[in-house]
Curated annotation (Swiss-Prot):
UniProt family annotation: Belongs to the UPF0224 (FAM112) family.
Residue numbers spanned by region Disordered: 67-103, 131-169
Keywords: Metal-binding, Repeat, Zinc, Zinc-finger
Binding residues for Zn(2+) 1: C9, H15, H25, C29
Protein name per UniProt: Gametocyte-specific factor 1-like
Annotated Pfam families: zf-U11-48K (PF05253)
Zinc fingers (CHHC U11-48K-type) by residue: 6-33, 40-67
Organism: Bos taurus (Bovine)
InterPro entries in the cross-refs: TRM13/UPF0224_CHHC_Znf_dom, UPF0224_FAM112_RNA_Proc, Znf_C2H2_sf
GO molecular function: protein-containing complex binding; zinc ion binding
Length: 169
């Protein structure tokens, strides 16, 4: 088994981290070094590329992951930009050409015109426990008339008995 490639931490050059753990280490080291973190910025093409803010534009122009992001952007579904108000009067302006989706993307709907899902308001209904229903049925058909069963709902509705012995004193 080959050893995994090690990356150098931008917050502390003495830290050498395996690539598989690098994102976790960056988050941890960023929290532990807030002063240094204020001077650093993440690349928009790869969050593991953390560079000084002054060198960010230079890095993003030459970033190795830039081409990957541009390819993914070209594979995105149909995008149409509407002309702005300044272009409405200009008839010589070229028509807006929508970006067509890649035909290899079979799991994306090409029309992309689904109605927006809106959750309708929830109306709560009275919930009934099955055991309560069975208990009330057995109360109605009690085979022993000498021993009437009381439902727990009957006990809750009765007011508590008052102790009048304390009132006489």
């Amino acid at each position: 088994m080959e050893p995994e490639a090690l990356e150098t931490c931008p917050y502390n050059p003495h830290h050498r981290i395996p690539l598989s753990r690098f994102q976790y280490h960056l988050a941890s080291c960023r929290r532990k070094n807030p002063k240094k973190a204020k001077k650093m910025a993440s690349c928009k093409y790869n969050a593991c590329h953390v560079v000084p803010i002054k060198k960010l534009e230079e890095h993003e122009a030459a970033c190795v992951n830039k081409s990957t992001m541009e390819e993914e952007d070209s594979l995105s579904p149909l995008k149409v930009s509407l002309p702005n108000a300044g272009q409405k009067g200009n008839r010589n302006a070229s028509p807006v050409s929508p970006r067509l989706p890649n035909p290899d993307l079979w799991n994306v709907d090409s029309t992309n015109c689904h109605p927006m899902f809106v959750l309708k308001s929830f109306i709560p209904q009275k919930l009934v426990c099955e055991s309560d229903t069975r208990e009330s049925e057995t109360d109605d058909h009690n085979p022993i008339p000498d021993c009437p069963r009381r439902r727990s709902s009957d006990r809750e509705s009765e007011p508590p008995a008052e102790d009048t012995s304390l009132l006489k004193a």
